[in-house]
C-alpha cells in the first residue's frame, strides 16, 4: 500500500552521484537513494587546512586573521580539491562567503566532483550564499561530474526562489545533464507540479526530448487527432446501453501515460484526490434512475443490486490475494470501504517487487463505423455527476494522450461484446473476477492521479502481442467492471484512429434472450441450436472466443509478465437464469476445493454449467494471433466435426494447461498458434448436451459475430501498421541522408581545419620573426626606460626619506599618546587606591583617637596620684628638717594617714563600683549598638535596594552605551576593512599604473616600429630615386654617344667632301678645318666654363647648407640646454614647494601640539575637579566608576583607532599624491625622450641627405676630373680643380665633425635619459618599500593592539581583586562604626546630591559654552575667509586699476609726444612744400612707423606742382595726418585692451593665498615691462 499511495520505488535517481537525500539538502544522483553519500562534505581534520576549518565552522575573524597574516591563500585547496568557499557555501556561512568573495577568490573553482561553490550552495539550499555568489559573477551554467547545473538541483528541491535567481542571472533553462534531462524534464519526471508551472511561465521548452526520445507533446498531438476522429462520427441515441459503463471508466487527462521513464516506478501521493464514497453512492443511484428512465430494466436475477452480494464479492477479493496474479478491483458503491482496492494494490506491489512487467488488461471494444454507442446521450447527461463523485473534473471524460497513440500500435485480439442493462449479476461477478494480471486503476479509484504506467519502449510497441516482442513490455489496459462497484472503463490502446470507440450493444438480442429465458419454450431453444449449428459450420476456424459480450464483456488483451502467463480475455457472464444464491454456493465450493486460479468466478461458473474449464481459456493462448492470420485477416479452416466430445474436453483441458503456463515461454516464442476452431466446437457441443440454456447459445452466436468483427478490425489495424512502417522507413531514409550530409560537412570542416592550421603555423612563424624584431626594439626602449627610472628614483628618494621621517615622527607621537593614556589610567587607578587607603587610615585614626582619649584620662588619674605621693614625700622631708615642728603635727599626720587609708579604700570601692557600672553601661551600649546595627542594616538594606534599582537603571544605560560602543567598534572595524579595501584598491591602482606604464612602453615600441617602417620606406624611396638617377645617367651617356656617332658620321662625310674638293679647294679646306677646330675648342671652353660655374654654385649651396646645419645644431643644443635648465628649475621649484609644504606641516603640527597641550591642561584641571568630587562620591559610586572606567578605556581605544585611521588616510593621500607626481614626472620624461628621439631622427635624416649630396658631388667631381684629363687644360683650370679638391676635403672634414657632434649629442641624450629612468625606478622601489613598511606597521599595530588589550584586561582584573579586598575591609570597618557614620552618610548623600546637580549643571554649562565657542570660532573663520577673499579681490581690482591708469597715462604721454613730433614734421614738410615747386609724394614716417599700417608708400614720379595749387595740397596733408592720428589712437586702444585682458587672466591664475603679494607685484612689473617692450618694438616709442 505504501508504494502505491505515494512512496517512491527503489529506482535510480535521475541526476548524478553527487546528490543524495538529506534533511535540508537536495540530493539526487544515479546511484540509489539510500546511498551513504551526502551533499554536504564529510569533514576530516587531516584533509583540511586552517582556513578550511575556519570557513566550515563560520569563524569570520579567524579567516580574516589567516588571510592578513598570509598563512594560507584564498584559493588554497585541501586534499579533496575543496576551497574555503566550497565549505562555507556547503555549511551556510554567508559572512565567510562575502569575505572570500571580496578578497577576489576564484568563484568558479571545482572540487573533486567538479562541482562549484554555487552548485554546493544550491544543493544544500543555502539561498543567501548562492545569492552572494551570483551577485559577484558566479557562472550558473557550470556542470558537475554528472552534467547537472545549479538549476537542476534547484528544480529537484522545488526551490522556486532559487530557480528564479538563477534564471535572472542568465542560467540556461535548456541545459541537459548526462541523461539528456533538462530542468523541465526533470521536474516532470520527479512529478513536481509547482516547479513545472514555474518553468512553463519562464518559457521553458515543452518539446524537450530525453535519451529514449520520449516526448509528452507526441501524446497531446495524438490525443487531439483522436478527438477529431471521434467528433467526425455521428452519435446514435440508441446505443446508450453499450456505453453505460464507459461514462465511469473514461480516463481523464490525469490518467494518461507518464512523461518520463522514471515514472514507471515512482508512486508519489502528492496529488492524490480523496474519494467521497457518499458521492459515489449518490452518483450510482442517479445512474440507475437515468437507466430506468431510458427504458433499460434489469431482471430480478441479475439486474438488481442486493446487499447480499457484498460479502460474496469481498470473499472473492480476499481469495484472490494468495494467487500469483495481480488483480486490482474497483470500488463498490454498495460497500463503502476501500478494502478490495487495498488488497489488489498489495498484490500489484508484490508483482512489481518481483520484477514483473505489469500489463493491465481492460475490456474495450472496437466497433465498425456503422456501430455507434447507444448510451452516449445518457453518458453526456451523467458525465458531470459521475466525475464530481469520483473526484475528477469534466475534462477527464476526454481521451487520454495514450489512447490515441496506442491506436495504430495495438495488434491484440478484441471481442466486441454487448453491455446490456439486463446483465446477470453472476455474469457481472464472473466478468469482474476474470481480470487478468493487473487492471488499470484510474485516479478516481486507486487513490492517486499519479499512478505510474508501464514504460514505453523505443519502437512504441504498445499493445503488440508478447509473441512478437523480444523482451516483455509494460502495457496499460483498462477494463470495465459490471459489479455493484463504481464502474470504471478506460479507453486505451485499442481505440481506433477514425472510429468512435464505444461498446456495442444489441437491445433486440437482449430482449430475445429475456423472452426465451423467461418462457423456457423449446421452440426458441431449437432455433438457438439451429443457429449454433449454422455458426459451427461457418465459423470453424474461430478460436476460443469471449462469450460474455451480452453482459458488456471486455475486449481480449494479451498480458505479459516475468512470472505471469499469457492470460485469456475476460469472459462474459454465462447463464442468465442463475441467481445470487447459486453464486454464493459456487464461491463456497471454490473455497473448499482450494482451487487457486486467476479467474475464480469464471471457473465457478464453468463448474456450475458443466462447461469444461479448458474450453474458454483456449483464447488466452490464442489471444495473440499468428502473423499469417493478421496479414490475411481470414481464419484458417479446420474441420471440427470429426472430433468427439471427449476430444473437445481434452482439448479444453490442454488449453487450460496452456492458459496456466508461465509467460516466459510466451515471451520467448515469436509465433504462437492461431485460434483453434476445435475449442469452439467442443464448447458448443458441451453446451448443447449439458446446458440447454438459451443465454449460452446466444453468447456463442454473439462470440462468432464478434470474432468476425475482430477480423475486420485487425485488417484495418494491419493497414494502419503498414502505413506507419512506411512512414518510419521514410523517416529512416531521411535520417540516413542527414547523416551523410553531416559526414560530408564534417569532412569539409576537417579539410578547412587543416588549412587553417597551416595558416596558423605560417602566421606563428611570422609572429616569431616580428617578436624577435620587437625584442630588439624592446631592449633598447628598456634601456632608455631604466635610465629614466633611475633618474626618477633619485629625485623621489629624497622626498621619500622626508616622508618616512614624518611618518616615523607621527608614529612616535601616536605611541607617546598611547603611553600617556596608559599612564593616566594607571595613575587614576593608583589615586583611587590611595583614596581608599586614606579613608581606611582616617577610620583607624578615629579609633586611635578614642583609645588615646581613654589613655589620657587614665594618665591624668595616675598623675594626680603621683602628685599626691610627691606631696607626701615633701612633707616628710620637711618633718625631718623641722622635727620640732613635725612632732606637733605627727598626730595630725597619723590622723591624716588614717583618713588617706579610708579615702583609698573608699576610692577602691568606688573604682570597683565604677567598673561594674562601666561593664553594665558597656553591655547596655552593646545591646544598643546591636539594635542600632539592626536598624542600620535594615536601612542599609533599603538603601542597597534603592541603590540596586539605581544601579540596575545605570547598568541598563551602561548596556545601551556599551551597545553603542560596540556598534561604534564594529563601525571602526568596518572602517578598518574599508581602509584595507582602499589600500588594496590603491595597490590595484598602482598595478594598473604599472600596466599603463607597460602599455605606454608597448605603444612607444609600436611607435618605434612604425618609425622604423617609415625609415625603411624612405630608404626604399631613396634607393628608387638613386636607381632612377643612374638610369638617367645611363640615358644621358647613350645620348652623348649617339651624338658622338652622329658627329663622327658628319665628320666622315665632311672629310669625303673635302677629299673630293681637295683638288679644287685645298686651301679653303684647310682654312675651314682650322676654323672648325677653333669653334669646337671655343664651344668646349664655353661648356667647361658653364660647368665650372655650376660647380661653384653647388659648392656655394653646400657651404650654405653646412652653415645652416651648424646653425640648426647650435639651435638644437640651445634648446636642449633650455630644456635641461627648465627641468632643473622645475625640480628646484618642486623641492622648494616641498620644503615650504614641510614647513607648513611642521608649523601645523606645532600648532596642533600646542592645542593638544592646552586641551591636556584643561583636561588635567577638569580631572582635578572631578577627582575632588569623586573622592566624596567614591563609596556610593564604586561600581559605576568601574563601568565608567571600562567605557573610558573603550572610548580611548576608539579614539586611538580613529587617529590611526586618520593617519592611514593621510598616508594614503600622500602616497596617492606621490604616485601622481611620479606619473607626471614619468610623463614629462617620456615626452622629453620622445622629443629627443624626434630631434635625433631629424638629424639622421639631414645627415643622410648630406651624405647623398656629398656622394653626388664627389661623383660629379670625378667625372669632371676624367673629362679634364681627356682635354688639355690650361693652368687656370688646373688651379680651379685644385681649389675644388681642397673645398671637397674641407667639406668632408666638416661632415666628419658634424657626425662627431651628433654622436656626442646622442650619447649625452642617452645619459640624461638613463639618469631620469634610474630616478624613476628608485622612486618606484621606494614606494614599494613604503607599502611594505605600511603593511608591517599595520601588522605591528595589530599585535600591539592585542598586547594592549591583554595588558588592560590584566590591569582590570588586578584592580577588581584589589577593590574586592578593600571593599571587604571597608565593610568590616563600617560594621564596627555604623552608628557614628549614619549622620555622616546622610550629610554626604545630601552633599553628594547637591554637588552632583551642581556638577551636572556646570558640565552642561561648560559643554554649552564649548559648543558656543566652537560655533563662534567656525563663524569667525568663515567670516575671516570671506573678508580675506573680499580683501584679495579688492586688492586685485585696485592693482589692475592702478596698472591700467599708469599704462593709460604712459600711453597718453607717448601719444602726446608722438603728436608733437608729427606736428613738427608736418610743419617742416609744409615749409618745404611751400618753398619747392616740384614735390615728391611724402613717405610718412619712417619704415618702422610703416609697420603700424603694414604698407609702404613708394614714390612714383616727380610731380610738378604749380604755385597756385599749394592750398589744396596742404589740405590733403592735413587730412592724411588726421587719419594717421585716428589710426594710431585706435591701435593704442586695442593694445591697451589686450594688455588689460592678459593681466586679468594672469591675476585669475594666481593662487588665492595672501602670502603671494610680492610674487604678484613682481609679475605685474614683469608684465608692464614686457608690454612697454612690445610697444617700443611696434611703434618705436
Curated annotation (Swiss-Prot):
Pfam families: Ank, Ank_2, CCDC144C, DUF3496. Its main location: cytoplasm. Residues 308-319 have a biased composition (Acidic residues). ANK repeats lie at residues 46-76, 80-109, 113-142, 146-175, 179-208. The modification Phosphoserine is found at residues 13, 239, 260, 511. Keywords: ANK repeat, Coiled coil, Cytoplasm, Phosphoprotein, Repeat. GO terms for cellular component: actin cytoskeleton; cytosol. Disruption phenotype: Deficient mice display hyperphagia, severe obesity, gigantism, insulin resistance and elevated serum leptin levels potentially linked to defects in primary cilia. One of its GO terms (biological process) is fat cell differentiation. Transmembrane segments: none annotated. Residues 229-250, 327-337, 491-504 have a biased composition (Polar residues). Residues 715-845, 876-1345, 1396-1470, 1521-1550 form a coiled coil. Residues 1-22, 225-270, 299-343, 361-381, 488-652 are annotated as: Disordered. The keyword Transmembrane helix does not apply. It is found in: Cytoplasm, Cytosol. It comes from the Eukaryota. The keyword Nucleus does not apply. Widely expressed. Expressed in the arcuate and ventromedial nuclei within the hypothalamus and in the ependyma and the circumventricular organs (at protein level). Residues 367-381, 505-516, 524-538, 585-601 have a biased composition (Basic and acidic residues). PROSITE patterns: ANK_REP_REGION (PS50297), ANK_REPEAT (PS50088). Acts as a regulator of adipogenesis. Involved in the regulation of the feeding behavior. Interacts with TRIO. Interacts with GPS2. Interacts with CCDC85B. Interacts with HMMR. This is Ankyrin repeat domain-containing protein 26.
